[in-house]
Swiss-Prot record:
Keywords: ATP-binding, Ligase, Nucleotide-binding, Purine biosynthesis. It catalyses: 5-amino-1-(5-phospho-D-ribosyl)imidazole-4-carboxylate + L-aspartate + ATP = (2S)-2-[5-amino-1-(5-phospho-beta-D-ribosyl)imidazole-4-carboxamido]succinate + ADP + phosphate + 2 H(+). Signal peptide: none annotated. PROSITE patterns: SAICAR_SYNTHETASE_1, SAICAR_SYNTHETASE_2. Pathway: Purine metabolism; IMP biosynthesis via de novo pathway; 5-amino-1-(5-phospho-D-ribosyl)imidazole-4-carboxamide from 5-amino-1-(5-phospho-D-ribosyl)imidazole-4-carboxylate: step 1/2. This is Phosphoribosylaminoimidazole-succinocarboxamide synthase. The gene is purC. The keyword ATP-binding applies. It comes from Acinetobacter baumannii (strain ATCC 17978 / DSM 105126 / CIP 53.77 / LMG 1025 / NCDC KC755 / 5377).
Length: 239
């Protein structure tokens, strides 16, 4: 598969066309960003760690019957994926209160949410990825009611699979975001799953093992990502 034209440069990944109309190549970079690009740094090895971690998670989800865009790793920083028609709405599941939920609702961080909450956010950096509801997403043509329902069902299924997986590594899956797209009329999980897009805490100490270490200036960001990988048995020895 030949990498061709650069299609898009995101906050932490670059997207390239290939010589196959149904596939793209994603390149994971070492960039770390927070607060809609107001804080940006380069973190050595981050791209390699996230690429390998994402591949591990995508394979686990596929084993659970969840279709993803992941095809195969091409290099330490590159992955071949299906070319999806992306839906510009992020799905967020929260198992515990953290981040913007605490700020919006005055909830104490760490409060368990039973059942887990489900939220939608419109993907637009210029607007700060605002929270939206289903009727807005449908009325504005971002997704159909059927697509949104499928996305919701799949997001909860991902939550069930990954809560159990992280629990095996003595970690709490606090919250996470997912992006979906359409591939040959099917709703398929896209983008990535890594500590960049979720919150993970040590079950006993509540040590943060995710991107909040970067947002909050706690340090040891990549080291925390590597710790998460090690707890799950993700082999990083060759990168």
């Amino acid at each position: 598969m030949l990498k061709q034209t650069l299609l898009y440069t995101g906050k932490a990944k670059s997207v390239y066309e290939t010589d196959n109309a149904d596939h793209l190549i994603l390149v994971f970079r070492d960039d770390a960003s927070a607060f809609n690009g107001e804080k940006i740094e380069q973190l050595d090895r981050k791209g390699k760690v996230n690429n390998r971690f994402n591949a591990f998670i995508m394979e686990k989800l596929a084993e659970a019957g969840i279709e993803t865009h992941f095809e195969k790793l091409l290099s330490p920083t590159e992955v071949l994926v299906k070319k999806l028609q992306m839906i510009p709405v992020e799905c967020v599941i929260r198992n515990y209160a953290a981040g913007s939920l605490c700020r919006r609702l005055g909830v104490e961080e760490g409060k368990e949410l039973t059942p887990p909450t489900f939220e939608l956010f419109y993907k637009d950096d210029g607007l700060g990825d605002p929270m939206v509801n289903e009727s807005q997403a449908i009325a504005l043509g971002w997704a159909t009611a059927e697509q949104l329902e499928q996305m919701k069902v799949l997001t909860y299924k991902v939550n069930d699979v990954l809560k159990a997986l992280f629990a095996e590594g003595n970690m709490i899956l606090v919250d996470f975001k997912l992006e979906f797209g359409v591939f040959h009329d099917r709703i398929v999980l896209g983008d990535e799953f890594s500590p960049d897009g979720c919150r993970l805490w040590d079950k006993d100490t509540k040590k943060k093992l995710d991107k909040d270490r970067f947002r909050q200036g706690l340090g040891g960001v990549v080291e925390a990502y590597e710790e998460v990988a090690a707890r799950l048995g993700v082999d990083l020895s060759d990168i």
